UniProtKB/Swiss-Prot annotation:
Belongs to the IMPDH/GMPR family. Pfam families: CBS, IMPDH. The lineage of its organism: Eukaryota, Metazoa, Chordata, Craniata, Vertebrata. GO terms for cellular component: cytoplasm; nucleus. This is Inosine-5'-monophosphate dehydrogenase 1. The gene is Impdh1. Its EC number is 1.1.1.205. Mycophenolic acid (MPA) is a non-competitive inhibitor that prevents formation of the closed enzyme conformation by binding to the same site as the amobile flap. In contrast, mizoribine monophosphate (MZP) is a competitive inhibitor that induces the closed conformation. MPA is a potent inhibitor of mammalian IMPDHs but a poor inhibitor of the bacterial enzymes. MZP is a more potent inhibitor of bacterial IMPDH. IMP binds at S329, D364, G365, G366, G387, S388, Y411, R412, G413, M414, G415, Q441.
């Protein structure tokens, strides 16, 4: 028998890899490419991995994915799509307060459960009024009441089927002449549960189901389109009223209080205080103000990269923390300001401290691949915020353009001069609103068209699940528990190891991710 073989039982297993504590013990600044996670034992399928995770103290998401409040990433279309797939979007504030609040309102109106403030018309309104409402709101199924208001007697409903083939000369026709009358309507009584109402709607094969009280007065309505959305998007992030969750960004200055008021009126579920360096008297004062005026509104503070920064914001009362400084693909803060921290170290250090107080952490920036998402979650982050990864998708703001035959969309950092010139909100984020000379902390560029996130986000979700499967963690909470207990093991990578772990040795190749 060869002398290098040891005979006997197989019970002995040598220690292998580093715990997270050991990985970050030497004060090295590590980012996601600097380490790998060692595989564990698989006894479940990838689809069984539970990705439920906390966004804030009181808000939980079924998918740990968030879109960044950047003006080339998140407006209503992105926020709606992210919420439908179990995440959440944060509407940027590099715009007027009114525009931002209206974007939030679009998200909240997209799916509503019981609609208690629908568009209502009276029999004396015209077909033209219905067409105008369709242009403004995107639908034409409108209940008709005696006075044209909620709480009035229901007398009928007008749908697209009632007016589709009317000539333009008939647009002045009164709704009383074209509406489907009350006697032909299927309705549900006030007090019915949403589940019961949906069952009635499904059986009726109608597009809308009016809810009426004992006096036959309209008190609410539910839509068949919402029933379809429930079927097609089972992971959707919703509030207690069955509306999609929506976040919004605000600054930390006095005039941001007006913006905050409009956002809360529009229905924003959570506010992120948008600052490149969150450990400031301005942010602490704003947290105190919000918690005093809107005690039930969830507030995310940041950005921070150290436990000391996190402490001040946690003491002020934040419900979540956004971690990252200078690590985004369009960010030059570390280069220009000599301030920041490699993202892997930042996430681990802040998450390890914040968990003692029940404050979830968002890993914001530096995410280039689904593997980076898994690593961020394995270091203690509850959710991951994405900018460049979602830029240039169909849902991202902006128009496509062509350069050298490639379809592109603009993507810029909120610290770029381009963004600062558009609105003072970007200047305030970087404490530059009063400066004569603006110091750019970001760049402006373009990214190749990625298509819809309706395909991209499911790929990310599946990738996270498969990553957790290889690790041996059946949920994100188990993943974090394994990390903090020391069961999860890591290993540093040399530059040669990083090259080895990528595509190499080929003359040419095509990299298709999904």
């Amino acid at each position: 028998m060869a002398d290098y073989l040891i005979s006997g039982g197989t019970g002995y297993v040598p220690e292998d890899g580093l715990t997270a504590q050991q990985l970050f013990a030497n004060a090295d600044g590590l980012t996601y490419n600097d380490f790998l996670i060692l595989p564990g034992f698989i006894d479940f399928i990838a689809d069984e991995v539970d990705l439920t995770s906390a966004l804030t103290r009181k808000i939980t998401l079924k998918t740990p994915l968030i879109s960044s409040p950047m003006d080339t990433v998140t407006e209503a279309d992105m926020a709606i799509a992210m919420a439908l797939m179990g995440g959440i979007g944060f509407i940027h504030h590099n715009c007027t307060p009114e525009f931002q609040a209206n974007e939030v309102r679009k998200v909240k109106k997209f799916e509503q459960g019981f609609i208690t403030d629908p568009v209502v018309l009276s029999p004396s309104h015209t077909v033209g009024d219905v067409l105008e409402a369709k242009i403004q709101h995107g639908f034409s199924g409108i209940p008709i009441t005696a006075t044209g208001t909620m709480g009035s007697k229901l007398v009928g409903i007008v749908t697209s089927r009632d007016i589709d083939f009317l000539a333009e000369k008939d647009h002045t026709t009164l709704l009383s002449e074209v509406m489907t009358p009350r006697i032909e309507l299927v309705v549900a009584p006030a007090g019915v549960t949403l589940k019961e109402a949906n069952e009635i709607l499904q059986r009726s094969k109608k597009g809308k189901l009016p809810i009426v009280n004992d006096q036959d007065e309209l008190v609410a309505i539910i839509a068949r389109t919402d029933l379809k959305k429930n079927r097609d998007y089972p992971l959707a992030s919703k509030d207690s009223h069955k509306q999609l969750l929506c976040g919004a960004a605000v600054g930390t200055r006095e005039d941001d209080k007006y913006r905050l008021d409009l956002l809360t009126q529009a229905g924003a579920d959570v506010i992120v205080l948008d600052s490149s360096q969150g450990n400031s008297v301005y942010q602490i004062a704003m947290v105190h103000y919000i918690k005093q005026k809107y005690p039930h509104l969830q507030v995310i503070g940041g950005n921070v990269v150290t436990a000391a920064q996190a402490k001040n914001l946690i003491d002020a009362g934040v419900d979540g923390l956004r971690v990252g400084m200078g690590c985004g693909s369009i960010c030059i803060t570390q280069e220009v300001m000599a301030c920041g921290r490699p993202q892997g170290t930042a996430v681990y250090k802040v998450a390890e401290y914040a968990r003692r107080f029940g404050v979830p952490v968002i890993a914001d920036g530096g995410i280039q691949t689904v593997g980076h998402v898994v690593k961020a979650l394995a270091l203690g982050a509850s959710t991951v915020m994405m900018g460049s990864l979602l830029a240039a998708t169909t849902e991202a703001p902006g128009e496509y353009f062509f350069s050298d035959g490639v379809r592109l969309k603009k993507y810029r950092g909120m610290g770029s001069l381009d963004a600062m010139e558009k609105s003072s909100s970007s200047q305030k984020r970087y404490f530059s609103e009063g400066d004569k000379v603006k110091i750019a902390q970001g760049v402006s560029g373009s990214i190749q068209d990625k298509g819809s996130i309706q395909k991209f986000v499911p790929y990310l979700i599946a990738g996270i699940q498969h990553g957790c499967q290889d690790i041996g963690a059946q949920s994100l909470s188990v993943l974090r528990s394994m990390m903090y207990s020391g069961e999860l093991k890591f290993e540093k990578r040399t530059m040669s190891a990083q090259i080895e772990g990528g595509v190499h040795g080929l003359h040419s190749y095509e990299k298709r991710l999904y």
